[in-house]
């Protein structure tokens, strides 16, 4: 098994442990640290995939230069390696996406179960991901956004960093709401912002898929 897939499976297991810790009201600061580690590992499985396919030629500094600093030359090199991963890896990027979905659904489900997030939000998130993933998977365009809007809202490094940061802030705060009785109103604002961003990204995916037909 590839190191990237092992990392994905590990962070998936870590998220399930995280759900249990939330439910038993484990100390919030430790729970939030574990949540942060799970999110950080999401970046590392992508790196490990590139690291292996490049035969260890791409170091972490080069990868960060491409994905964080948006260096054009480094980005083109990394994208070429990622394309090779999609062609040669047994599961390609699909197992990484599955890990992302398990992690995200787990957070939405646990806070819906705790009556912090309305059920309708969870249902709409499931519908959005199900249809967007199906359409993008059929067309294989998830990393090939063509219009400036869809690139900006979905595939740009800025957009990806923003959605991950918002997920962390939102769910970390909801942990504080449940464990430490923080004010729920701020949590609702964060959930609304995250939900809106996710729906916009879903619209970008569906729009790009429809255009490619």
What are these regions (language model features)?
Residues 1-9, 15, 30-35, 140-213:
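C-terminal membrane-associated helical module and adjoining short loops/tails
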Residues 6-94, 108, 117-125, 183-197:
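Membrane-embedded alpha-helical segments that form the functional core of polytopic membrane enzymes
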Residues 14, 45, 99, 103, ...:
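Short active-site segment of divalent metal-dependent hydrolases/proteases
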Residues 16-22, 102-115, 170-178:
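Membrane-interfacial alpha-helical segments at the cytosolic side of multi-pass membrane proteins
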Residues 21-24, 48, 52-55, 113-116, ...:
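Juxtamembrane transmembrane-helix termini
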Residues 103, 122-130:
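Hydrophobic alpha-helical segments of small multi-pass membrane proteins
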Residues 128-144:
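Membrane-water interface of transmembrane alpha-helices
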